[in-house]
C-alpha cells in the first residue's frame, strides 16, 4: 500500500521522471516506475566516465560479490530482502536467479547479475 500511494502521488505530479545513477536503487526505481506507466530517463555516467572499482558499463554493477549480505530472516538484511520480495523487487529476483554459494549470504555472479539488470532496463519501452 505504501508504494502504491507514493507512485500515485508521483504519477499525478509528472508523466516522466529523470533518475540519476543506474546503480541498485536507480535501476530498481526506474523499473518500478516504468512498470507503473511512468516514462523514465535513466542517466548513468559509465561507461563514458569509468571508476576505479567498476569493470563494465552495466547497470547495478556490484563491486563485491557478497554485497547483498545475509539472507537470515532474523537479520536486518534478511528482513529487508523479505520486504523486497513482497514488494516485487526486480533486482532481488535477478539476484536470486544469479546467486552463487555463500553460506547464509546472498552473493551473486556480479557480471551475470549486472548484465541481467541491464537487459531488463534496456528492454523496457518506457525507460530511455
Regions found by a protein language model. Give the residues of each.
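General structural feature for long, well-ordered alpha-helical segments within catalytic domains
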Residues: 25, 29, 80, 113-117
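Feature captures the FAD/FMN-dependent oxidoreductase FAD-binding
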Residues: 85-128
Amino acid at each position: 500500500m505504501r508504494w502504491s500511494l507514493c507512485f500515485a502521488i508521483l504519477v499525478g505530479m509528472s508523466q516522466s521522471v529523470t533518475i540519476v545513477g543506474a546503480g541498485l536503487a536507480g535501476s530498481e526505481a526506474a523499473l518500478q516506475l516504468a512498470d507503473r506507466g511512468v516514462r523514465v530517463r535513466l542517466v548513468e555516467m559509465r561507461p563514458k566516465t569509468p571508476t576505479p572499482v567498476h569493470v563494465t558499463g552495466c547497470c547495478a554493477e556490484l563491486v563485491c560479490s557478497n554485497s547483498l549480505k545475509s539472507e537470515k530472516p532474523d537479520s536486518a538484511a534478511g528482513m529487508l530482502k523479505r520486504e523486497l520480495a513482497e514488494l516485487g523487487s526486480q533486482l532481488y529476483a535477478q539476484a536470486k536467479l544469479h546467486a552463487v554459494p555463500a553460506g547464509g549470504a546472498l552473493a551473486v555472479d556480479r557480471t551475470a547479475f549486472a548484465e541481467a539488470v541491464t537487459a531488463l532496463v534496456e528492454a523496457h519501452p518506457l525507460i530511455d
